[in-house]
Amino acid sequence: RLRMRLRSMRDGLVNVLAEMVDLKDPLARRHAERVREHSVELGRRLDLSGSDLQTLSTAAFVHEVVDLRMPAHFLGKNGPASEIEHQLIRRSFELGIQMLEDLPELEEVVAVLKFVHEHFDGSGFPN
């Protein structure tokens, strides 16, 4: 019963986070849903456990939350970012992660989100 209550609280929190993203960028909600669908399908093909699939699904759905502190004009910017813009993007990402780290219900989700801007070739950030 306690586990169900905790899951319900986490689901409610995830919905609030999704609404926050939706308020900043209405197209982001559909994007988040597509990312979740593709991520879960990939996780199934990799035979992830049920709990890992749930974590992946949640992380994929709320991945835009880490960008909430991103200046709005960066969201639709075309072309390469300047060094100053890269620094701002990284800092906004770090602040978004810090915001989510204050939510113990999302500890595993945050562990996944920390790598959302990493690339297979080792480029990207934060590492």
Residue ranges and their predicted role:
Residues 8-127:
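Histidine- and acidic-residue-rich, metal-dependent catalytic cores
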Residues 1-5:
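Juxtamembrane or sensor-core-proximal signal-transducing alpha helices
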